[in-house]
């Protein structure tokens, strides 16, 4: 068992003990850079302001929650990784109009799929494994990404996720999709 997996198991165990005592650990992080992607356009701000709600697929830990709250938007967050999902729930605890859901989105319901947990804080976890070709590509070259663990998850279509959770899709007209290569399959399932 690798050191990272042992750390995850220990962290999970400690959190469970605290929860049994009625306590909750909240991780304080350095806030992200104001905008690592460059200048925000007025057009983007207007779209965020004018939308009814936000559907964020590939939530990770929900670092954008404060921004969405600032706009006063209701948000549905979807994250596949069960390890990251618990932290997502904790991070969204104070945002009552933001709902976290755990699902591996695809174009078929209830299909058992391999889901690879990556290093890089789990941010690149995916149904696709890193190959040497991917690691040498322009996007990933020199980053040393790798998958640490493979788990089995059942897939769910976006339509099924909406039905199971009584979500009206038209209430969420601003979509952010970052599913590490599963974007097209997810859209086919909607």
Language model features: what each stretch is:
Residues 2-190:
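Phosphate/nucleotide-binding beta-alpha loop and adjacent structural elements of enzyme active sites
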């Amino acid at each position: 068992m690798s050191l990272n997996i042992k750390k995850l198991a220990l962290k999970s165990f400690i959190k469970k003990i605290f929860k049994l005592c009625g306590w909750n650990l909240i991780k304080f992080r350095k806030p992200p850079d104001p905008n690592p992607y460059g200048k925000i356009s007025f057009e983007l701000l207007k779209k965020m302001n004018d939308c009814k709600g936000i559907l964020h697929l590939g939530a990770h830990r929900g670092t954008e929650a404060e921004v969405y709250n600032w706009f006063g938007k209701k948000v549905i967050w979807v994250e596949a990784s069960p390890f990251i999902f618990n932290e997502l729930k904790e991070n969204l605890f104070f945002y009552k109009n933001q709902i976290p859901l755990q699902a591996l989105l695809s174009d078929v319901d209830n299909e058992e799929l391999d889901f690879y947990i990556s290093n890089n804080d789990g941010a690149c976890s995916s149904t696709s494994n890193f190959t040497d070709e991917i690691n040498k590509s322009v996007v990933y070259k020199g980053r040393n990404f790798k998958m640490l663990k493979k788990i089995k998850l059942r897939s769910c279509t976006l339509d099924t996720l909406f039905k199971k959770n009584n979500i009206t899709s038209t209430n969420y007209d601003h979509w952010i999709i970052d599913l590490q290569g599963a974007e097209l399959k997810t859209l086919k399932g909607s």
